[in-house]
């Protein structure tokens, strides 16, 4: 049986991979492990707008209450809200039902501990082991069975918290917001209007059939069009559960996670709030991002792909900002997970405070051309490039040739018999040739 938990909880096609039975079992096992067998644990449960959300919430809630948990249902709400509300309500755990940026047929179940952090691998393994080994858990009866309560003030609690993460307001700003028909629909329109912005909305109803369909952070084309048509200052695109943000400048250009992190890190440094003068990002962040930070005297630490690895490094080193090119950005002084709304507020606030358009702010970084080529290799040899002296020597030669203005990244595919060869640098034709020759060398040596 394959591992249930991936890099972001349990995810799959709802009612096929992620069945109500599995949701029930996750509820039972998750509540038991996270609350250390406490008799009456408290668990916050939220969801995005997917049509399978009701089905899975009912099953999950049945599982949680069957081991005696008190369920606090907070309805359709962003993933980072569940992390925050778990702390605010002093709950023992939080659970979010969402598949983030994935298509509508998918859904997922993601757990948070009592402090609002995603679970480490070893805790997920314990939950998974209970399910796979069919370990018997307590089944209380009578008054020992848990109950479910709806907290109707949760959205207001989260909105007030979000407002506290910036100084001042957003008056005189014209902002287009794309909520991807997802969880941010219940928060972002109210939040930005209450802060005084003139708001133009797209995809701002929680319609499960439309979530992420040609909208949101993975499809910003409509947002780009609306920003230009309305003469807006900025466009903001969230994904289905609002843990990531992609922006659009006043000229209609996309501003990705690398640019947003660079803008925010430089601002934090100016204000003396960039802890340890360091930003954490993954190996996928562009070399242009690294160079932009270096020019400002800011250090960069890179991690494996996945916001959980970024967060682990941030908590270990006590850093204040980290994230991914995709727009998952963590402001650890404010929340314990990527938060699209916090990121949006910071970005808009910096633009207003500085009096600079987003295009001017984004000019702090130049995105270098990137070439990605897949080298086909035998599955069992995907990691052998690490030991091959000729391949290692060639990578060193290429990086030396680029003199700090480019880089080579080799990543074995997690699912296919491929090694991905990525080269970044100033000259597209040159790096294309480099990537092609390196991929050919890897194929020759590892087959």
Swiss-Prot record:
Modified residues (Phosphoserine): 100
Entry's Gene Ontology molecular function annotations: magnesium ion binding; phosphoglucosamine mutase activity; phosphomannomutase activity
GO BP annotation list: carbohydrate metabolic process; peptidoglycan biosynthetic process; UDP-N-acetylglucosamine biosynthetic process
Cellular component terms (Gene Ontology): cytosol
Active site: 100 (phosphoserine intermediate)
Broad EC category: isomerase
PANTHER family: PHOSPHOGLUCOMUTASE (ALPHA-D-GLUCOSE-1,6-BISPHOSPHATE-DEPENDENT), PHOSPHOHEXOSE MUTASE
UniProt name for this protein: Phosphoglucosamine mutase
Organism of origin: Thermoanaerobacter pseudethanolicus (strain ATCC 33223 / 39E) (Clostridium thermohydrosulfuricum)
